[in-house]
Every structure is written in C-alpha cells, then in structure tokens.
Amino acid sequence: TSLWAKNSEMEANSKLWIKTNSVEDELLSDSSYDEMLLSNVKSAWMVEMWCDEENIRSIEKDLDVNPGDINYRVDIMAWLIHSSREIILADDVFSDEHMPQIAELIKQLDVLRLRVRHGCKEDLLTLVNIPNVGRYRARELSKLDIRTPHDVANMTKKKIDQILKIRGWGPQLLDKIMLEVAKVIEPSKQKQQKVRLDDIPLDDEI
C-alpha cells in the first residue's frame, strides 16, 4: 500500500514532484505524474530515507507521515525483497552461465533487506545485530572506530570511558551489550612475548 500524496505534494515544484523527476529514469511505470505515481515514489523515498539513517522526526516532517506509516511500509518492503529473493532462487529459466550474476544479485538483496529491516547503511550491519544496539547507537560506536562485535569485545578502558560520555549511554547498558557479545566472542588475549635467557646479549655482544 502506497503513501498517498497530499494535495500540496501534487503541485509542480513540490519536494515530491522534484524527487519524482530526479528518479524518472529508474521508474518502471510510463504513466504521467499522476497521484498513484507520486504516491509510489513517496513510499519508496520514505524507505530510502530510513535506510540512509535519516532521523525519524525528519522523515515524519518532510513527508508528513507518522511512525506507524514508517513501520508498516518498512515491513512490507522487507517482505517484498525477501519474496524477490525466493522467486529468483526458484526460477529455472537461468542457465548455469548466469549463476555468478544470480549469486551476486542474491547477495545484494540480502544486504538490502537487512538495511531496510534495521534502517541503516551497510557498514553498520555487523553492529545492529547486537541486542540493545540499534542504528543510532551503532553509528555512535562506529564514530569511535568500533565497527564489529570483535571491536566491542576488545574495547579498551579509554574507549569505554568515551562511550559513557555520550548522552543515552550508561554503565548498565554497556554491560548488557558487552555481555551479549561475550556470549559469542571471547576478547582476544594479548600474548606477551617471554624473554628467553639466551636472547639477552652478553656484555661483549652489546
């Protein structure tokens, strides 16, 4: 179900009209800029903004929608992407020589579905899967060069102190996140090199 374009968005030079014009070459429909076309573009634009980590308040304001609209369309889009993936896998019209391209397409669809589900860019996908880490917290971690669960498991005290200074973070929350990561990843242990006696130079060798 598409988001209906408002009367103001039907007018030439509205934000939605300009957006539709900018993606005209990507549209599968040849219809003129009627209400249905603008509504379809509006729905796709909303999901695009969501995946590009736009603030929810900004999406609501720019597109005149509410949180329910966003959640509903995001769920539908994720389902459509998954369905597309299954159709491609089940289709037997492709020959063996197309398998590398099919595999790449499936990979891209999987990434896109995860981006739609979590509302983030691709570089955050390894972080947003951690319980209690949504897209906002994941982006805050990435700004501190913490980009993977391994990075979380091996955070230094300095990194932890930096995180706790960020608004919305607290010791209890960070402990929960680190405990979740510790269930699947053990912090790498720094191996200290032992100095062997025969490695110590003699006086006449210095």
Predicted regions and their residues:
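C-terminal helical accessory/scaffold domains
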Residues: 1-129, 135
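Accessory alpha-helical DNA-binding modules that contact the DNA backbone or grooves
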Residues: 88-100, 112, 116-126, 131, ...
